[in-house]
Amino acid sequence: MQFRTKARAVDLLGKGQIADLPTAITELWKNGYDAYADNLNAALFKEGFEELKKSYFILSDDGKGMSSTDILDKWLVLGTDSKSRAEMDIESEETLWKRPRIKAGEKGIGRLSVAYLGNPMLMLTKRIGYPLQALYFDWRLLENYNLFLDDINIPLKSVANLASLESVFNDLKKDFLSNFDKEFDLDDKPIWEGKQIELKDEIINNTREALLETSILKNIFSIFNTRDSHGTLFLTFNPIEQILELSEKDEERIDDKEFILSSLFGFTNDFKDHKKDIQVSLKVFDDDNQNYELLNSAGSFFNANDYNFADVIIDGNFDGNGNFMGNLQIFDEVVDYSFSSIRSKNKNNYY
């Protein structure tokens, strides 16, 4: 006997575990950070920008990217433990020759956060010296409680050159639609029934309507334009309303927008006065053919200079076992301060 997994389990592990939009974006940015990206970008392309027929959302990084083997052995494997073994990377091609980073993700399911952004989705990813990989999927397929994971086909193809991307994209859509060829299970029961028939029709129609419009292709080409290009890009064809509202100036929605932006501000540590390891960006390309930055143009949420206005400052360092050594400043008085962790000292607890 063996366990069998319903497709719904992936939906519950992914979108079901994401509280809000900032969490979804942050989880994907964490994966970009772990992939040694320098730049983590998000961009909303509004309907009407350069004659776009629809709105799109793109989330990208310039990390090490993935080969087809990486996708099959890691990205499509849930709960991978490579980040939770407490093993530091070695400076090499795997780190893009950068200083090893402490991993931000650890559960192996952060990639499923992309389901929260909208549907359907096209993932493009490339490692240095490897061909571009394209994966197409609509996460709503996982909402069918009659499907098992091994019933589902997730199409993946290599892109020999950017000129063939549209052709490959059409092949991916065709392969994805084969998920609906089978109408009955082994017990001769309908796979799609009741209210889910409406969901099925919506998924099929959204896939048939999905296009790579000129402005979107230009953005993709700017990222993957050479053999040595590297990184990962998620293109969402029907972004959720929360994403679309990022471009709104309606006073009634300003609180929701401010919550999203303030949450994303916290992804980087602006209390450090030296150069950041990474840069984050959230741009809007609106229907007036204008583009503007939401995160960096809004002013720093906090910065290192704000320390000067604090009444209490704790300044020091933690070692890999959770012990702290430094000093505590209360108004003008500075005292030495240390803390010894009671955590057991083993390699799984070392950071």
Which positions does each model-derived feature cover?
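Solvent-exposed, non-transmembrane alpha-helical starts
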Residues: 244-247
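Intrinsic-disorder-associated interaction segments
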Residues: 2, 158, 165, 250-257, ...
